[in-house]
């Protein structure tokens, strides 16, 4: 304390606070002009605004209010550093038309609605010294646009009308005096309740880090565009199924399909007694694997399949992979034991959302042997074709 030359601790605290304020305002004071003759206002992010203007910018208006993007930001110089100013923002119609989007372009569509009493937005830092306004860019990021008059300080605009933001600088702290009104043609936009031009939607997604909410259902259901869009703006997320052990694509075109050929309720149901068929030289039987993008339970035998071997109703018991189509003893006949195995793996499982019969004794789908000796279900597409030269017509399930 002695080094600061303060007589009391409170004096030292005041001196420290005043020095902080002085250093904070020094940057703005260097840009000041007490006469205000060199007052200048510059639009920040002008190239971005220009890019939106080239395709006719659109701004969303909602009942609860929606913030603008791009955000209106300006830089000011030439204010009196020691004078007090307030910054205000309103929106003025740019023409006498109502607009509509037809065949990829905006065209006039009749007379505009009567002008409403739009609220004037006062920057939350107002009033403040000129040095404060000049030290950094002034952002109107909290402005909300609405299409309903709710009296909450939001800016009410008519949908399908074109507007241009206007910034007003008012000197306060004495007799109020309007110092400057300024606007920028690059910031013109059409108020809409939903984006009409897909190019505008793409630009919003590309440059706005909070644009995930702008994605519509069509874009969410077309993942082929996801990698490109995600590389442009890292804020986008797509829902996808966990990666299967057989290497499913990250953004699969079958996102709405289940990962396994049967629902979990069927996967967990047990049946007994069973006869296990798998690839082996001892019984010369082959069971074809499912599609490599389906997730199957892990097992010591990758191609293991269980088929009920019973004349009556099935009873609970352990099973690796339950058979959903019980085979009755009277429904199977084998006429040609010398057939060859049909290795058409594409007919192993049904990939559509078809209802599956429950595994009970009251529902049975008979199997009928064809001339070639293969076994196939009646009515639906063939699920499994089995043939074995070691089996004879006298053998029954």
Curated annotation (Swiss-Prot):
Keyword line: Developmental protein, DNA-binding, Nucleus, Transcription, Transcription regulation
An annotated GO cellular component: chromatin
Stretches for region Disordered: 220-248
Coiled-coil spans in chain: none
SMART domains given in the database record: TBOX (SM00425)
UniProt-annotated location(s): Nucleus
Main localization category: nucleus
Keyword Transport: no
Gene Ontology biological process: cell fate specification; heart morphogenesis; mesoderm formation; positive regulation of DNA-templated transcription; regulation of transcription by RNA polymerase II
Name of the protein this chain belongs to: T-box transcription factor TBX19
């Amino acid at each position: 304390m002695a080094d600061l030359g303060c007589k009391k601790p409170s004096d030292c605290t005041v001196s420290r606070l005043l020095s902080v304020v002085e250093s904070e305002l020094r940057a703005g004071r260097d840009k000041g002009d007490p006469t205000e003759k060199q007052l200048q206002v510059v639009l920040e992010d002008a190239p971005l605004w220009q890019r939106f203007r080239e395709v006719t910018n659109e701004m969303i208006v909602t009942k609860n209010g929606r913030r603008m993007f791009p955000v209106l930001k300006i830089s000011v110089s030439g204010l009196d550093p020691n004078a007090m100013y307030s910054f205000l923002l309103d929106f003025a119609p740019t023409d006498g038309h109502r607009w509509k989007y037809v065949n990829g372009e905006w065209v006039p569509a009749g007379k505009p609605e009567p002008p409403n009493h739009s609220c004037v937005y006062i920057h939350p830092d107002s009033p403040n010294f000129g040095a404060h306004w000049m030290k950094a860019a002034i952002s109107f990021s909290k402005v909300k646009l609405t299409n309903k008059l709710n009296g909450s300080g939001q800016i009410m605009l008519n949908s399908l009308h074109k507007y241009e933001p206007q910034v007003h600088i008012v000197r306060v702290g004495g007799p109020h005096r309007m110092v400057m009104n300024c606007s920028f043609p690059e910031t013109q936009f059409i108020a809409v309740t939903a984006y009409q031009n897909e190019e505008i939607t793409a630009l919003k997604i590309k440059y706005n880090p909070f644009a995930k909410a702008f994605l519509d259902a069509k874009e969410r259901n077309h993942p082929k565009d996801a990698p490109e869009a995600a590389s442009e703006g890292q804020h986008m997320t797509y829902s996808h199924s966990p990666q299967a052990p057989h290497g499913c694509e990250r953004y699969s075109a079958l996102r709405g399909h289940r990962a396994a050929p049967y629902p979990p309720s069927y996967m967990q149901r047990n049946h007994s007694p069973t006869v296990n068929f798998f690839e082996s030289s001892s019984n010369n039987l082959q069971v074809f694997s499912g599609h490599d993008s389906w997730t199957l339970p892990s097992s010591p035998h990758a191609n293991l399949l269980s088929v009920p071997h019973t004349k009556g109703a099935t009873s609970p018991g352990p099973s690796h992979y339950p058979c959903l189509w019980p085979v009755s003893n009277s429904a199977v006949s084998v006429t040609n034991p010398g057939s060859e195995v049909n290795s058409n793996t594409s007919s192993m499982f049904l990939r559509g959302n078809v209802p599956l019969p429950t595994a009970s004794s009251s529902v049975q789908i008979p199997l009928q042997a064809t001339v070639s000796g293969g076994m196939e279900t009646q009515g639906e597409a063939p699920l499994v074709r089995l043939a074995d030269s070691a089996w004879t017509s006298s053998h029954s399930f």
